[in-house]
Structures are given as C-alpha cells and as structure tokens.
C-alpha cells in the first residue's frame, strides 16, 4: 500500500502566517496541470517506490486545490487512473477554502471521486479571520459544511488555530464549541506559528503584536484536548482529533512509515530507503517536466536517519512505537537504546509503555519536540 500526494500551489491570496510554497498568480494553472499529469507518467509507482504498490490514499494539498476548475481536476484524476493501481476503498482528500465551496464547486465535486474535504476554518471570529488575511467569514464555514453534506460528503475535516495575540481562553473555547456544533468528522488544531519570512513574523519583530506566553498556550492546548475528547473525538495525534473510524488515513500513513509518492512543485516522495523532493519554483518545474526531466533531488536513508524519522513521526501518534516491530526492523542495539533513553521520561510521567508500545503521555504531548530530541542520533 502507498499514498499519493498532489501539490497544488495556487492561492487567490496569501495568509500572513503561511510559510508553505505557493503563488497567487493563477495564469500557470493550465501548464501546471499538464505538468502534473506528465510527471505521473514519468514517475510510476515502481520507479518511485521500488515496487508496483497499490495506492490507497490520495491527497490534493496546497496552496489551495479548490483554485483549480473542474477541467483541471478531471484531467488530474484521469492521469491518476491511467498511471497507478488504485485500491477499491480509497480515501481521497481535497483541501479547500470555505468560500470556494460554492454551488458550482459542489457540482464539480459530484463528478469526482473525492470523498473527504479538509477546510481551513482557523477561527469563527471574523476579526481574527481578517487579522490572518483569510478570505472567508465565519458564516461561510457553516454554509460550506451544509453544501458538502447535501452532495453526500460524509468525511469533513476542519483546521483551527489558537494562540492569537490577545486571544482569551473564553474566545478559544467559543471556537472549539463552534467546531463541535458543526459535527464534522475530524478536527486539526495548531498553535499560531511565527515562521521567519512571513508577514506575521515581521509584525512580531516590529513590535506590532505580542506572542502569548508558553504557559497560556499550554492551557489552551489542554482545553482543546478536554473539550474535543469530551465530545467524543479521539485524540490520535498531537494536533489531530477524529470521530471513531475517521482518522486521516493519508496523514496516518506519513506517521507510520507507509511509502508515498509526491507529485508537483515542492512535493516529497518516500519509500523507506530513499527520500526525494521536487524543485519549488513552479516555472522551473513546468519547464523541466516539459523537457522530460524530473526536477528532483534525493537522499539515501541509512538506518540512523530512518530511526530518527521513526522517532519524529510515530511518537506523534497515540499508537506510539511498536517495540517488537521496532527491534525486528532496526535491531536489538537500537531497540535497547530507545528503551534506555525512554526510562527518564517514563519516570517523569512524560512517556508510557502499554501493550508493547512506547508513547507520549498527555503531559509529554505538549513538550513533544523536547522529548523526541533526546532520542535523536546526530
């Protein structure tokens, strides 16, 4: 089994916090779509993964994939069917902005095999949405969910953000409760990050806004966990919550070392032995593909790199690391090292071993980066 990621780097406007590679120029959509389809032809599963793996999940991310029209999307799915072996019970996700979920967009969706939508709600406060330079308003999130339900989409995920400058705990509670009332199947929630190079980062450095303190951010995170688990959501990854049976299969594959193929500018591929990534620049990507050249670089993964990857991905999940499988794959020496390093964290209540799995406790989740860094082999 394997996953397929398609990167759509187009956005109508750019949010002030976004550090992902994207462009607000839409004039290259036709050429870019053609290049995506050509890359799929040039990068079959056997070449990308070393074997003809069956694709079980597809994820259209960005950017904003909903900036493509029906013709573009039909062209992409035609190329997917032509170049890959597809499983029967697939999860096919598309990211979109709430204001893109119009009647016309829903008519397009009805003609496509997409069965999961991931929307960036971020907050239900219009003032904070304007602060982020988001295009939609709070009411459009509800309208989008209703429209998607009406065309038969039964797996909807929304993203939330917390830790806005001067955001109160009651305001954050209001956002969480609003999300619960929408009764979506999946919720992802992230602390607002000040990534270098973004407008938000410059506002912080210029003293125009202040970052909330770490203890207050922790309180917000704990409130998130309490509210969502109390409403019946499973907390299955540091930032992700799902109704039973609705965990993101595609993202879970990243966290459990499942191979995946990345198509498009800046997309990454992984097959357990090698990691590769495409060039970011869209025009260079299109030109290279047109010339029959895959614009990518790669690195071979030695056992220590793979071990580090295991730590930084699998420990993010509630499942944690299967210790028996870990020893079978990495050998007794590394398995013993892992257990030895874990003892101090277990004694401090940051980790636990249950049913042969090593995982973070609730106390360990908030400082997961610090905990995981202790296991890394430099």
Regions found by a protein language model. Name each.
Residues 3, 104, 339-340, 370:
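Auxiliary N-terminal substrate/complex-recognition segments of SAM-dependent methyltransferases
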Residues 363-378:
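Short, amphipathic alpha-helical interaction segments positioned at domain boundaries
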Residues 1, 22-46, 54-332:
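C-terminal scaffold of the Radical SAM
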Residues 347-356:
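A short, conserved structural fragment
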Residues 357-361:
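Minor-groove-contacting beta-hairpin "wing" of winged helix-turn-helix DNA-binding domains
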Residues 9-20:
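Local cysteine-cluster metal-coordination motifs and their immediate loop/turn environment
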Residues 332-344:
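Short amphipathic alpha-helical interaction segments
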Residues 1-8:
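Immediate flanking context of iron-sulfur cluster ligation sites
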């Amino acid at each position: 089994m394997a996953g397929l990621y398609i990167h759509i780097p187009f956005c109508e406007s750019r949010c002030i916090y976004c550090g992902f590679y994207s462009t607000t120029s839409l004039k290259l959509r036709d050429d870019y779509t053609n290049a995506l389809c050509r890359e799929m032809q040039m990068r079959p599963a056997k070449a990308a993964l070393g074997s003809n793996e069956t694709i079980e999940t597809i994820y259209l991310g960005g950017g904003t994939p909903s900036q493509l029209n029906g013709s573009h999307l039909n062209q992409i799915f035609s190329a997917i069917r032509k170049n890959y072996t597809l499983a029967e019970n697939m999860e096919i996700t598309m990211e979109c902005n709430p204001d893109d979920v119009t009647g016309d967009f829903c008519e397009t969706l009805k003609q496509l095999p997409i069965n999961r939508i991931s929307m960036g709600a971020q907050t239900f406060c219009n003032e904070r949405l304007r602060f982020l330079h988001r295009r939609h308003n709070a009411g459009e999130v509800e309208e989008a969910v209703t429209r998607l339900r009406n065309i038969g989409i039964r797996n909807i995920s929304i993203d939330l953000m917390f830790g806005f400058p001067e955001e109160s705990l009651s305001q954050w509670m209001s956002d969480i409760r609003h999300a619960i009332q929408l009764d979506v199947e999946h919720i992802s929630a992230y602390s607002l990050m000040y990534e270098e190079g973004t407008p938000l980062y410059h506002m912080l450095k210029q003293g125009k806004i202040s970052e909330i303190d770490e203890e207050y951010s922790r309180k917000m995170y704990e409130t998130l966990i309490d509210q969502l688990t109390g409403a019946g959501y499973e907390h299955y990854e540091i930032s992700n919550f799902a109704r039973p049976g609705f965990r993101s299969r595609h993202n879970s594959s990243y966290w459990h070392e499942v191979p995946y193929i990345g198509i498009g500018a800046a997309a990454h591929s992984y097959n357990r032995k090698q990691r590769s990534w495409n060039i970011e620049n869209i025009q260079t990507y299109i030109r290279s593909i047109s010339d029959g050249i895959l614009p990518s670089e790669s690195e071979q993964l030695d056992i220590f790199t793979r071990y580090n990857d295991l730590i930084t991905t699998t420990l993010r999940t509630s499942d944690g690391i299967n210790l028996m499988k870990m020893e079978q794959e990495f050998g007794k020496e590394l398995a013993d090292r892992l257990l030895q390093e874990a003892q101090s964290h277990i004694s401090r209540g940051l980790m636990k071993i249950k049913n042969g799995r090593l995982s973070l406790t609730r106390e360990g989740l908030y400082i997961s980066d610090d905990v995981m860094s202790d296991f890394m082999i430099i």
